[in-house]
UniProtKB/Swiss-Prot annotation:
Pfam families: SelO (PF02696). ATP binds at residues 86, 88-89, 109, 121-122, 172, 179, 258. This is Protein nucleotidyltransferase YdiU. PANTHER family: PROTEIN ADENYLYLTRANSFERASE SELO, MITOCHONDRIAL. It comes from Salmonella enteritidis PT4 (strain P125109). Keywords: ATP-binding, Magnesium, Manganese, Metal-binding, Nucleotide-binding, Nucleotidyltransferase, Transferase. It is an enzyme of class 2 (transferase).
C-alpha cells in the first residue's frame, strides 16, 4: 500500500509557516520504531530497514506528497507574554491521508534550524526524544488523548545543553498540531481575520458538522473548552504532571502535547512540581486545572472579534463542567463505585489526606485498593500505612460504602483494575532506559515500551514498584 500525503495546512494557511527542508544529523541511525502504530497506519516495513540509512525518520529523504513547513505561533510562558515562538526545531513534513478523509500530521522534532529557532540550535537530544516517545505511548495506552511517537533516530552530532549530549530526532504524529498559541500570534499582531481563518480551518477539518451552522464559532470553542476539561481530568486522576503548561503547549483538539519536564506522581503530593525551573510552582500538580482555565481565557480573548462575550463565558463554564463531571466519574470508577452518593467526595478527600500524611504511592495505593473484598477487613494496603488506626477507620467506611451497591466483588474489582494502572512511566524508569541508550544499549528502551503497552496488568517486577532511593525526586528541566 502506498502512503498518501496532503498539505492542507500549507495550502490553506499561508501566513502561518515557512517552507523549508530538514537538516540531517551526522551518522543518523534508527534505534526504535513503533511497530504496532506502523502496522495500523499501513506504513511499509521497508521504510524501517536500517540498511537504507535514517531515511525519512532522520530527515534525509521525503515521501511523495510531503511538503515540509515550520509553523509560527506565539504564547504566554509561565503566565507572561513571550511574543513570537514557533517550531524552533520541528518541521511538519506532511499530513497522511487516512480513511474517511481524516489526516495525521507527521512532525519531525529535532530537524534543524528554522526561522523560529530564536537562540536555539534547532536540535533535540537523545534524552528528550526517548522521554517523549515513552510518555506519549504510555499516555495512549492509559487511554488519555495524546500525540503519538513513531520513531527515534540517534546520531553522532554533538549538542550542547547543560552538558554535551548527542542529537536525535523524533517522528511525532497527531491529528493536528494546532495550538492556542497559533491564535494568540495573529491576535496580538492585530490580524483578527487570520485568527478567524484558523478557526475556519479547525471547524472545516475537525468539526465539519458545524460548518453551516450560524453559531459555529461558539459551538467550536465550547467543544475546545470541554475537551480541555476532560483532558485535565484525566491527567489529575492518573497522577500526571505536565510541567510546562504554556499556552503554546495547549492543543486545540485536547491532546497532551510537548512532553518536557513531565512526571507521574510517586508519593502522593498535590503540590508536586515536576519542572525544576518552575520556581513559583505555577505548574504544580494541583494547579493544573486552574492553569488550563487561565490558558482558555487567553484563547477566548483572541476570539472576541467574532464570538460574543456571553458565548465565550458559557464555553469557559463548559470547561468547569466537563472537568468536574469527568473527574468525578473517573474517581468513582477508581474507587469501585457504580453510583454517585453524597458522601463520596468526603470519602475520597479523607483518603487523599491520609495518603498525603503518609507519603503513600499514588499509583500503587489505588491499584492495591482494587483488590478489596467487601466482607474482609484485611487488605495488603493496610501494611503500607504507618497510622493503621486511621487507615482502618477509613477502610471500614469505604467497605460500608461498597456494600450499599448490589455489585459483587469480581465485577467491581474488574472495573477498578481497568482504570487503576499497575504501571505508569515513573521518571526513574525513563532515566534507566536513557542511561543505557546513551551507552549504546537500546534493550531497556524497547523493553520499557513493551511494558507500557500493558499498564493495567499486574506485575511483580520493578516496573510496578516504588522508585529506588536514587530515583526519587529526579529533577527534570525544560532543556531538551
Amino acid at each position: 500500500m502506498t502512503l498518501s500525503f496532503t498539505a492542507r495546512w500549507r495550502d490553506e494557511l499561508p501566513a502561518t509557516y515557512t517552507a523549508l527542508l530538514p537538516t540531517p544529523l551526522k551518522n543518523a541511525r534508527l534505534i526504535w520504531y513503533n511497530d504496532k502504530l506502523a502496522q495500523q497506519l499501513a506504513i511499509p516495513a521497508s521504510l524501517f530497514d536500517a540498511t537504507n540509512g535514517a531515511g525519512v525518520w532522520g530527515g534525509e529523504t521525503l515521501l511523495p506528497g510531503m511538503s515540509p513547513v515550520a509553523q509560527v505561533y506565539s504564547g504566554h510562558q509561565f503566565g507572561v507574554w513571550a511574543g513570537q515562538l514557533g517550531d524552533g526545531r520541528g518541521i511538519l513534513l506532511g499530513e497522511q491521508l487516512l480513511a474517511y478523509g481524516s489526516t495525521l500530521d507527521w512532525h519531525l522534532k529535532g530537524a534543524g534550524l528554522t526561522p523560529y529557532s530564536r537562540m536555539g540550535d534547532g536540535r533535540a537530544v537523545l534524552r528528550s526524544t526517548i522521554r517523549e516517545s515513552l510518555a506519549s505511548e504510555a499516555m495512549h495506552y492509559l487511554g488519555i488523548p495524546t500525540t503519538r511517537a513513531l520513531s527515534i533516530v540517534a546520531s553522532d552530532t554533538p549538542v550542547q545543553r547543560e552538558t554535551q549530549e548527542t542529537g536525535a530526532m523524533l517522528m511525532r504524529l497527531a491529528q493536528s498540531h494546532m495550538r492556542f498559541g497559533h491564535f494568540e500570534h495573529f491576535y496580538y499582531r492585530r490580524e483578527p481575520e487570520k485568527v478567524q481563518q484558523l478557526a475556519d480551518f479547525a471547524i472545516r477539518h475537525y468539526w465539519p458538522q458545524w460548518q453551516d451552522v450560524p453559531e459555529k464559532y461558539a459551538l467550536w470553542f465550547e467543544e475546545v473548552a470541554a475537551r480541555t476539561g476532560r483532558l485535565i481530568a484525566e491527567w489529575q486522576t492518573v497522577g500526571f504532571s505536565h510541567g510546562v503548561m504554556n499556552t503554546d503547549n495547549m492543543s486545540i483538539l485536547g491532546l497532551t502535547i510537548d512532553y518536557g519536564p513531565f512526571g507521574f506522581l510517586d508519593d502522593y503530593d498535590p503540590g508536586f512540581i515536576g519542572n525544576h525551573s518552575d520556581h513559583q510552582g505555577r505548574y504544580r500538580f494541583d494547579n493544573q486545572p486552574l492553569v488550563a482555565l487561565w490558558n482558555l481565557q487567553r484563547l477566548a480573548q483572541t476570539l472576541t472579534p467574532f464570538i460574543e462575550i456571553d458565548a465565550l463565558n458559557r464555553a469557559l463554564d463548559r470547561y468547569q463542567d466537563a472537568l468536574l463531571t469527568h473527574y468525578g466519574q473517573r474517581m468513582r470508577q477508581k474507587l469501585g463505585f457504580f453510583t454517585e452518593q453524597k458522601d463520596d467526595n468526603a470519602l475520597l478527600n479523607e483518603l487523599f489526606s491520609l495518603m498525603a500524611r503518609e507519603g503513600s504511592d499514588y499509583t500503587r495505593t489505588f491499584r492495591m485498593l482494587s483488590h478489596t473484598e467487601q466482607q474482609s477487613a484485611s487488605s495488603p494496603l493496610r501494611d503500607t500505612f504507618i497510622d493503621r488506626a486511621a487507615f482502618d477507620a477509613w477502610f471500614d467506611r469505604y467497605r460500608a460504602r461498597l456494600r450499599t451497591e448490589a455489585v459483587d466483588d469480581a465485577l467491581r474489582q474488574q472495573q477498578m483494575q481497568r482504570v487503576n494502572p499497575a504501571v505508569v512511566l515513573r521518571n526513574w524508569l525513563a532515566q534507566r532506559a536513557i542511561d543505557a541508550a546513551e551507552q549504546g544499549d537500546m534493550a531497556e528502551l524497547h523493553r520499557l515500551h513493551e511494558v507500557l503497552r500493558q499498564p493495567f496488568t499486574d506485575r511483580d517486577d520493578d516496573y510496578a514498584s516504588r522508585p529506588p532511593e536514587w530515583g526519587k525526586r529526579l529533577e527534570v528541566s525544560c532543556s531538551s
